[in-house]
Amino acid sequence: MKRNIILIMTLLALSIAYADRENDLPANLNSAFTLGAKNSSSLQVNFTLPEYTLQEETQGETVYRKIELPLSGTLLDSGMPELPVICTSIAIPCKGTVNFEVLTTRQTVIPDFLPYPVQQGNNLESPKSFVINNSYYNSGGTYPETLMEISEPSILRDFRIITIQINPFAYNAQSGDLTVYQDISFRLNFTDEQGINELVSEPTNISASFGKIYESIILNFNDYRNTMVANTPPRYLIIYGNNTDTNFANALNEYVLWKKQKGADVMVASTATSEAGNSTTSIKNYIQNKYNNVETRPDFVVFIGDTVGSYTIPYYTQSSGATDYNYTFLAGSDQLGDCFIGRISVENLSQFLVVLNKIYLYERDINIANASWLNRMMLSGDNAPSGISTMYIQKYIKEMSLLTNPDYTFTEDYGSSPNYSVINQTLNQGVGFYSFRGYIDWV
């Protein structure tokens, strides 16, 4: 379930980044799935394995083989075979449970196959200690044990969804055979039993701001497309750290006006006790009350203020780190955000004005002739202790980005100790996108 959530959130982030590209949404592997017969109690789904290649990887005197399947994820058990997986999401009925049954399969077998093991550590071009589960490679059985998995239902704002993970490659260490599933047909069965994360009713008023995300990750979104009203103004909820500085108020009003000029509906509140309040609980409740009313349900929540300074806004703590993401858990008991959230992390008026000038330059006053930096990206991953997935997600972002814009260039930095001077230098030179995954603590 955890890796399914990670995949979904990665797709969410990418969909946000490319939301303005109407006809150039990055490709994904949803094309590997097609929908079959459906009714109120079941849905048939057909899977066809996309084209893949085999590459050799030499470690010492041993030659391993690696399966290359663009845009796919992989199993991430350190030292075990690195085998691609393919996922999609399905919108399911608002109530009930889901199970599946495999109907038919077509597979081939590649004999004498030695798969490259998953490595926890630096990017593949850097020296590191080689990791292999010798116990499995010497006498293990079939890995993975299951052909497919489905997650528990989650709520992604308007939809109740499940994630389906197909494991099209299965390795048997005893025989040395790699089984490749070329075609799989399966059926999802929907029951009336009480399930988890149920919705009150089927989607009737879908957020246009989430439209590209739904289109990108929900395989059967076309069944619901007509319930989304095109060109609906995005709704912003801006919450700022309470203060009485008239210069701050003037700058804030200018920012709100700019959002309205762009066509957004904007609601504004401070952390005064009479408004949103100054604790995580009161602010979360304030956002929740706005969300529960379809007339005020925010698509975007923007905090103005850092965790210290003149405009403080409190934060949640996750694994000893500060986060605002918990504020977006507004529907269901899952960890999928139900609105977008961002923080303008400023401690004083001077910082606020600098950030606003950058926002206006980017959104309103940009000089395209001098904006080559829009085609540059910085990708960085700190894999200690977060693991190799910090690199895999950045590589995935790179693949998706190049499908959208082949002119993108990249500065990449991976390792257990990120090179902060490289990161700062790259940011100062200008980038259109910056993605960092892992632990971070530098000025």
Regions found by a protein language model. Name each.
Residues 10-18:
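Hydrophobic h-region of N-terminal signal peptides that target proteins for export
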Residues 19-443:
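Cysteine-dependent hydrolase recognition
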